[in-house]
């Protein structure tokens, strides 16, 4: 097993579509898959403020987010683990950059999607049950890669 370079970690974070958010409260772990975007060292997620994940985040903001990827013939994998704190994003300019990045990742048309999505966020900023964007401010980003030993 080898450490990923910073460039390899960045590349994975920019290209992998989904990851797993790990939460914990009272020594009970909880992991849930999430789509995400990565912008300048920060992982962004969106979630509705309800359910088990929301209850846990209210009590413990320390999280871990993991992504992984196999090469084409499944003989080598790479993973990145982001440790940090999950925090709400309330700045509309930051939200707009997240929406744009998500739009690009999903291949959506910016001329219609961005305006509609930003209108929704502006209208629901003060609604406690509306979809919210969160960011993981990382304390550490680690990465590993491993080649499978075939035939040994």
What kind of feature is each model-predicted range?
Residues 48-51, 63-69, 114-121:
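Short acidic (Asp/Glu) patches
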Residues 74, 78-152:
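Charged, gly/pro-rich active-site loop segments
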Residues 52-60, 64-87:
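Helix-adjacent hinge/juxtasegments
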Residues 1-18:
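Short, basic/aromatic recognition patches
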Residues 9, 53, 94-98:
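Amphipathic alpha-helical interface surfaces
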Residues 23-25, 69, 137-140:
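Short, structured patches in soluble enzyme cores that scaffold and shape functional sites
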Residues 16-49, 57, 65-66:
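Short beta-strand segments
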Residues 13, 56-57, 102:
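A generic structural signal for nonpolar/aromatic side chains embedded in well-ordered alpha-helices
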């Amino acid at each position: 097993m080898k450490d990923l370079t910073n460039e390899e970690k960045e590349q994975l974070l920019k290209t992998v579509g989904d990851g797993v958010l790990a939460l914990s409260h009272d020594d009970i772990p909880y992991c849930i898959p999430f789509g995400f975007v990565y912008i300048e060292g920060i992982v962004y997620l969106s979630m509705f403020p309800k359910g088990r994940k929301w209850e846990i985040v209210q009590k413990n903001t320390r999280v871990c987010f993991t992504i992984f990827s196999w090469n084409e013939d499944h003989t080598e994998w790479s993973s990145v683990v982001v440790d940090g704190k999950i925090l709400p994003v309330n700045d509309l300019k930051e939200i707009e950059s997240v929406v744009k990045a998500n739009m690009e990742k999903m291949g959506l048309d910016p001329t219609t999607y961005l305006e509609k999505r930003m209108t929704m966020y502006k209208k629901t900023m003060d609604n406690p049950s509306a979809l919210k964007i969160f960011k993981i401010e990382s304390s550490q980003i680690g990465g590993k890669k491993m080649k499978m030993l075939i035939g040994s």
